[in-house]
C-alpha cells in the first residue's frame, strides 16, 4: 500500500469524539463565506461522473440533494477547519463518499437485505466503485467511511473522511451535534444559503425520518437506532428557527 494514499483517500486517524477536536467551540477557525463555485464537484473525474449518474438514478431526489449538500458542507469544513488534511485529500474520494453514503436507504437496497443500511451501503459502494474503476484503496476508504458514518461516539478513532462525513451529515440533518457546542455555527450563513439554493432541503428531514422509521420497523436490530434520538430531538435546523 502506498503511504501517500493514506492522506489522499482520507485514512488519516482522527478522534472519534468530535468534541475532542473542537473543544468548547463549534469551530477551530472562524468560518468565512465560501462560494460553491470554489468547491465544485470534480465531475472531470470519470469515476465521479459515473457515480453521479448512478446516484441520480438510484436515489430519490430528496436523498440525492442531501448527498450534494453534504459534499459542499464537507468541502467547506475541510478547507476551513482542517487545511492540512484538505491540502492532501482527494476531492474525488470525498465526492464518491457523499454521493454513495445513503445508497443503502434506496427503496431497493433497504429491503434487499437484513443488514443495516449504512453497513450494506458501504458494501454496495465498494462493489459499485470497483466496477467503475476506482483504485482498491479509494473504494475501500469510501466503503469504510459509509459503514461508520452513523457510528458517532466518544471512544477510539476514525478515519478523516469518516469523521468528515459524520460532521457534514449531522450538520445537514439536524444542525446540532451531541458532542460539539453550537454546532450550527460551523458553516458560514452565506455558504449554507448558496448550498441550499443549489440543492434545496425541501422536506428532507420529514422524508428521511420516514426512511428511518421504515428501517426500524423491518429491521428492529438496525444500527440506525443509535442515531435516531439525535434526529428526533431536533426537527428543524437551528438556522431555520
Locate predicted features:
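Acidic/histidine metal-binding catalytic segments
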Residues: 87-90, 133-145
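Divalent metal-dependent phosphate-bond-processing catalytic cores, especially two-metal-ion Mg2+/Mn2+ enzymes
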Residues: 1-34, 58-61, 68, 75-87, ...
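An active-site-proximal "capping" alpha-helix that borders the catalytic cofactor pocket
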Residues: 70-73, 115-132
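Active-site flanking loop/helix segments enriched in acidic
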Residues: 49-66, 75-78, 104-108
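Active-site-adjacent bridging/hinge elements
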Residues: 43-49, 97-98
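His-Asp-centered metal-binding catalytic motifs of divalent-metal-dependent phosphohydrolases/nucleases
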Residues: 90-110, 117, 121, 125, ...
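Short, contiguous, pocket-lining structural segments
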Residues: 39-43, 62-69, 86-92
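N-terminal core-entry segment
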Residues: 72, 77-85, 94, 100, ...
Amino acid at each position: 500500500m502506498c503511504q501517500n494514499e493514506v492522506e489522499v483517500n482520507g485514512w488519516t486517524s482522527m478522534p472519534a469524539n468530535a468534541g475532542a477536536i473542537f473543544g468548547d467551540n463549534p469551530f477551530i477557525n472562524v468560518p468565512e463565506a465560501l462560494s460553491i463555485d470554489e468547491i465544485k464537484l470534480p465531475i472531470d473525474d470519470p469515476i465521479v461522473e459515473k457515480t453521479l449518474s448512478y446516484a441520480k438514478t438510484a436515489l430519490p431526489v430528496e436523498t440525492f440533494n442531501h448527498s450534494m449538500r453534504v459534499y459542499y458542507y464537507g468541502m467547506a469544513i475541510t478547507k476551513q477547519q482542517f487545511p492540512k488534511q484538505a491540502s492532501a485529500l482527494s476531492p474525488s474520494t470525498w465526492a464518491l463518499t457523499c454521493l454513495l453514503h445513503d445508497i443503502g436507504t434506496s427503496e431497493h437496497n433497504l429491503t434487499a437485505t437484513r443488514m443495516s443500511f449504512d453497513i450494506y451501503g458501504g458494501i454496495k459502494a465498494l462493489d459499485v466503485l470497483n466496477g467503475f474503476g476506482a483504485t482498491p484503496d479509494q473504494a475501500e476508504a469510501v466503503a469504510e467511511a459509509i459503514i461508520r458514518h452513523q457510528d458517532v461516539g466518544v471512544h477510539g478513532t476514525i478515519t478523516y473522511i469518516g469523521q468528515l462525513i459524520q460532521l457534514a451529515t449531522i450538520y445537514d440533518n439536524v444542525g446540532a451535534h451531541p458532542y460539539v457546542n453550537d454546532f450550527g455555527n460551523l458553516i458560514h450563513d452565506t455558504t449554507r444559503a448558496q448550498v441550499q439554493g443549489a440543492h434545496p432541503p425541501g422536506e428532507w428531514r420529514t422524508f428521511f425520518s420516514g426512511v428511518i422509521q421504515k428501517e426500524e420497523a423491518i429491521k428492529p436490530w438496525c444500527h440506525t437506532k443509535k442515531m435516531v434520538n439525535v434526529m428526533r430531538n431536533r426537527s428543524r435546523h437551528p438556522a431555520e428557527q
